[in-house]
Amino acid sequence: MVQKAIDFATKVHEGQYRKGTDRPYIVHPMEVGKIVSTMTQDEEIISAAILHDTIEDCEGVTAKMIEQMFSKRAAELVQKESEDKSKTWMERKGATIQHLKVAEREVQMIGLADKLSNIRDIDRDYPECGEELWQRFRMKDKETIGWYYKGVEEALRNSFSEVPAYIEYRSLVEKIFGK
């Protein structure tokens, strides 16, 4: 199932790049899957991690399609990790923080891995780009982006405080945005 998810995600993310870079987008879902695999060996969860942005960011991909190709559970996990793009950035991110506080552990794992992959990119690119880095995002204010990353850190603290991926995430949040 994991290989099938890799193949599908590679196909539907073709031609997409990480914001403000020339890195192929598929690098991100692959990293999210790898991070999740450090927390579970469940192939449905790992596959959902790899597929986590397909409904949200790939034209024509639906939950029904993922259910038919993979499983109902994988489709549900991807759907629970998808944002409502009709809402503002603040509304979406506030909803994500609230959702992660109460979501099932599997959804929290994917959320943690997604945000860890994103903040690793920020940490990697910041020394080269400096403050210009924030211009690549929809929300361009570093302080507001920091509010979001800190909110996610707090939302996941009780469930993951001893998990290496969370410890790395918390450390990068503090490094980039302060305490």
Regions found by a protein language model. Give the residues of each.
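Active-site helical microenvironments for divalent-metal-assisted chemistry
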Residues: M1-K179
